[in-house]
Amino acid sequence: MARIGDGGDLLKCSFCGKSQKQVKKLIAGPGVYICDECIDLCNEIIEEELAEANDLGLVELPKPKEIFDFLDQYVIGQSSAKKSLAVAVYNHYKRIQVGEPSTKGREDAVEISKSNILLIGPTGCGKTYLAQTLAKMLNVPFAIADATALTEAGYVGEDVENILLKLIQAADYDVKKAETGIIYIDEVDKIARKSENPSITRDVSGEGVQQALLKILEGTTASVPPQGGRKHPHQEFIQIDTTNVLFIVGGAFAGLDRIIEARSGKQGLGFGAQLRSTTEKKAEPSFADVMPEDLMKFGLIPEFIGRLPIITSVENLDQEALVQILTKPRNALAKQYQRMFELDGVELEFTDDALEAVADQAILRGTGARGLRAIIEEVLLPVMFDVPSRDDIARVVVTREVVLKNVNPTLVPREAPARKPTRERREKSA
């Protein structure tokens, strides 16, 4: 504790002006004093700034190849989409890192615009999972929104601001953290304009939603009701800047392949139509060939397409890819079910032809990787019901017949422990 001066006056904190009697501790320096309360306040300020720096990703940003390799551990195939996403995400967060503090006050500073991503491909091919895995790697808030539930403001349905509310909730209402998050908008093909020509009647769940999304995609300060706007109209709004929010927009875009085929001249009618050989007919147009004009014909408005400069696609998964999805990734389905049986002290084995049969069933159902779990659940349901109640089973073997013909899996019993010879038996043998 600092001592009382010669004049009899109490010493005071040089920062807040409180006397030594008003505080617990007063620390003296060369001509200055600081109290314990001001020290605590300084610590809080430093901790907040450090936390904010970490939330904004001001740590070492993984390089595109590192992002690609991380995605490879969880997502099978789709190399083109993974490369596009890795580069886009790296550039986006590099823009956030470098763009804010270093360019302030510089007249020659170049302002880098945001590049959102459009991800096209059939259902069950990993669009949502790719976005989830990216957010997991970067440790940023992540929210998934369904475009089919959205309507234009003033109509029954969800407002586009509800998408931002999900992101804020994912960040535990830390707005600064949410402002550097990732939002995945699924089923965006369902908000396509009903016809190529503008209609007199309002298209509140199609073109109207596209128009409403434009501002938040581009970057704006949006007012978000913390409890949803329509049920609680009288509430304070949360202000969130979407300039640094990365939007990944995905959809199956059924029928887009025919538009691509027609544009590329692979399809024709009449006497002037170009005939194709059998092999050419088998080669279907790829979503990788999509052009902005194809998306406009599908029903997306030019302004909406313009805010999604990066267009990439995922392709249908073949049998080999689906078998790899079942076995290779860290969280592969086969590994998950083997672990569940292991908890009951039972070994679960899938034969190679059984895995191929599961993959074939998923292709037949048209559900892609998303349908694999449902098929395995159907196959394993009887044994998952019985096994926990029995202690005589050592191993369960699933074969092709089990998957295709609804046969029960093979149950391998435990070996009975060797019986010790009794005294009577030993005497007889002697």
UniProtKB/Swiss-Prot annotation:
Domain of life: Bacteria
Transmembrane segments: none
Residue positions binding Zn(2+): 13, 16, 35, 38
Chain ranges of the ClpX-type ZB domain: 1-54
GO molecular function: ATP binding; ATP hydrolysis activity; ATP-dependent protein folding chaperone; protein dimerization activity; unfolded protein binding; zinc ion binding
GO annotation terms (biological process): cell division; proteolysis involved in protein catabolic process
Protein residues bound to ATP: 122-129
Keyword line: ATP-binding, Chaperone, Metal-binding, Nucleotide-binding, Zinc
PROSITE patterns cross-referenced by the UniProt entry: CLPX_ZB
Cellular component GO terms, alphabetical: HslUV protease complex
Signal listed as a keyword: no
Matching CDD domains: RecA-like_ClpX
Family: Belongs to the ClpX chaperone family.
Record function comment: ATP-dependent specificity component of the Clp protease. It directs the protease to specific substrates. Can perform chaperone functions in the absence of ClpP.
Subunit-structure text: Component of the ClpX-ClpP complex. Forms a hexameric ring that, in the presence of ATP, binds to fourteen ClpP subunits assembled into a disk-like structure with a central cavity, resembling the structure of eukaryotic proteasomes.
PANTHER family per the UniProt record, alphabetical: ATP-DEPENDENT CLP PROTEASE ATP-BINDING SUBUNIT CLPX-LIKE, MITOCHONDRIAL (PTHR48102:SF7), ATP-DEPENDENT CLP PROTEASE ATP-BINDING SUBUNIT CLPX-LIKE, MITOCHONDRIAL-RELATED (PTHR48102)
Name recorded for this polypeptide: ATP-dependent Clp protease ATP-binding subunit ClpX
Provenance organism: Kineococcus radiotolerans (strain ATCC BAA-149 / DSM 14245 / SRS30216)
